[in-house]
Amino acid sequence: ESYVCSDANACLYKLGMFGERLILEIFAFEHIKEPTIDNTHANRIRLLKREGLIPKKIDDILYALRKTRNDAVHAGADSVEDAKTLLSMTYNLAVWFMEVYGDWGYIAPAFVMPENVVQPDYESIIKEQEEKIVALSKQVEAVSTAASTKTSKERAEKGETASESMELSEAETRYLIDEQLRKFGWEADTNTLRYSKGTRPQKGRNLAIAEWPTDSAVGKNGYADYALFVGVKLVGIVEAKKAAIDIPSVIDHQCKEYAKGIKDEHQEYTINQWGAYKVPFVFATNGRKYLKQIETKSGIWYLDLRSGANAPKALQGWISPQGLMEQLEKDIAAANSALQNTPFDLLRDPDGLNLRKYQINAIEAAEQAVIDGKQTVLLSMATGTGKTRTILGMIYRFIKSDRFKRVLFLVDRTALGEQAEDVFKEVKIEELMPLDSIYNIKGLDEKEIDRETKIHIATVQSLVKRILYPEGDTMPSVTDYDLIVVDEAHRGYILDKEMSETEMLYRNQDDYISKYRTVIEYFDAVKFALTATPALHTTEIFGKPVFNYSCLLYTSDAADD
């Protein structure tokens, strides 16, 4: 606190150290061994997250402290505004720690930002603090003993509750949203990349420009919290609010008005006009992760203003600059028409996929479900009936008609992914070429995708790591894939039991299902599942099968042949 105004660089560095110390205290309290390999602060946080001990909001604060500490050490970061924002967030972090690992009945006093004292009386301060240390040490011993009587599960539940009751200011929320936007490919810094400080759209940069002025009379004198630009194209408006605000109402009462009120001098940045709207996409958020229980007060709410039929919906993460440009290129009505008018001759070709009637029927059922607007689709086909070839044919038609831009083929074990890769490479489908010669396919060994990628084969485990325990400073965009095809995901936990302890991602079957569902629901995509034996959690996510082909039918058809 004493450094916040006099030496912001030192303040940022020491706040980061506080975050490190707090994590080490949790390890000691929970009797958890620190990682034997790559024992870094970031990896220790990931380990505690896997144990369910670090809620999302706490993780966001710890990330901000760690990132800014590194910037302070290596880049000389010394923003007083950042130091003040992080100081108040760190106070909230300390309160959370006290509520979980100290006194469960603790009621924290309001945080008071320290004044810029030019020459403090250090001797008096030291004497006062030494007296406090003696008194507090006795209290700490008592409350720590009380907290240690609780189980780790109880503390995890308490930690989640305490983090959700934490109220961040709008400035703190904006700071965390800056960090989130940067993870998804946007340049964002509320304190420096502001309209009032001369920041304007530039070719080759993806800028989230803060406090963008509009002619709207709503909100803060018509200033949008962020305007999103891909190069010099205005593609989105973002409003950031405190946790207590109903987020969808912000889209109706503010975001839409900002999208209508783009100033005449900024018309050069607009792409088109959709009715009264001059911006295609709007977002509203309070920085809190999406929770179904408090749906309207969590998540990132998004609305595509290009059609009045679109309704606001909650997203699990942000859309990247590339993702928004791909959204602009979509024409679902035209793609559905192309899909319906594409014949099945290639899929029946004996020199190609050579699909049988029931496999064509499965694809037809899947396509009709998509045209009808279903977001989740389940196909049930008995073992040995050629699910992988059916999937290949279905994916080919969806991409060929441009109904979907990029497909995630998600498997529960490496062997299934390798099997799919082999089929995609070997089976001829068009002009005697296999799918991987027609479209860009990324295999199991490739984590990153690019604009040209059409199919990405990945395991559930790899996506859990990328989404829940990311190792770098980037996150997958929620629109990286617009179709997810899941093959036999119900067996994933059985395979994971065979992993070594250091590789374990799931504590038990319920934890596997929870994380599996998180991966599935993270992306704003149509989701398909193909399975021989639908598990309960599979039908809970995907619904009842739109197509069912049993062993009995397969045997009967084979006999007829």
Give short role names for the model-derived ranges.
Residues 456-483, 493-513:
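Conserved RecA-like ASCE ATPase "motif II neighborhood" in helicase/translocase motors
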Residues 554-561:
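Conserved small/polar residues in nucleotide/adenosyl-binding loops
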Residues 1-130:
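Amphipathic alpha-helical interface elements
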Residues 488:
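Walker B catalytic acidic pair
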Residues 543-553:
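A short helix-turn-beta junction within AAA+ P-loop NTPase domains corresponding to the substrate/partner-engaging
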Residues 98-406, 415, 419-430, 452-455, ...:
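ATP-dependent helicase/translocase motor core
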Residues 443-456:
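Conserved motor-coupling elements within RecA-like helicase/translocase cores
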Residues 383, 512-538:
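Conserved helicase ATPase motor motifs in RecA-like P-loop NTPase domains
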